[in-house]
A protein has these predicted regions:
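Hydrophobic, proline/glycine-rich low-complexity stretches
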Residues: 1-8, 12-15, 31, 42
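Vicinal oxygen chelate
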Residues: 6-15, 61-154
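Catalytic cores of nucleotide-enabled group-transfer and carboxylate-activating enzymes in metabolic
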Residues: 11, 21-22, 136-140
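Conserved active-site tyrosine of GNAT-family acetyltransferases
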Residues: 21-26, 113
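Conserved acetyl-CoA-binding loop of GNAT-fold acetyltransferases
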Residues: 28-34, 92-95
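Conserved short beta-strand elements that form part of the metal-binding/catalytic scaffold
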Residues: 32-68, 115-122
Length: 154
């Protein structure tokens, strides 16, 4: 293997307030905070693999872009569908709830206004909207997502 071999690409999302976004990504999406260094926050799963990076760039120190954002939706695929139900059992705020072949999925909006879809399905086409939110059973041993991947950036 050569030194120039790329093993994995980790997406970086610029945010205005890292602490506010850290709470959202950890509490709502079940990610694990791996490393805080300077303006960057590395997020991952229980395998301690870096999957997403938040970079703080306060609007007072950088030019704020006017108009539509380039990030329409961030699609995250979870290895275990039951972990999504464990997140929903916490009573988190979600915009849309879906049901698929493996289990539930949801869309939530970050403090920056980014739409994030968390699912465990092979194909997004099989997700159907759920009208009434069912009562989810709290899992006492749930500490966060065991494994996830950023599947798509739209």
């Amino acid at each position: 293997m050569s030194v120039n071999h790329v093993a994995r690409i980790v997406p970086v999302i610029k945010v205005n307030n890292r602490n506010l976004n850290q709470d959202f990504y950890v509490k709502t999406l079940g990610m694990k905070s791996l490393l805080e260094e300077g303006a960057q926050l590395s997020l991952g799963d229980q395998t301690r693999t870096e999957r997403l990076v938040l970079e703080e760039s306060p609007s007072m120190r950088s030019r704020r872009v006017k108009g539509a954002k380039k990030l329409a939706r961030l699609v995250i695929k979870v290895a275990k569908a039951a972990e999504i139900e464990a997140l929903l059992a916490r009573g988190i705020q979600v915009d849309n709830l879906y049901r698929g072949e493996k289990g539930y999925a949801f869309e939530a909006t970050s403090p920056e206004g980014d739409c994030i879809l968390l699912h465990a399905e092979e194909k997004l086409i099989c997700l159907q909207p759920v009208q009434e939110t069912p009562a989810f059973e709290v899992q006492d041993d749930f500490i966060g997502l065991s494994q996830f991947d950023v599947e798509k950036i739209e």
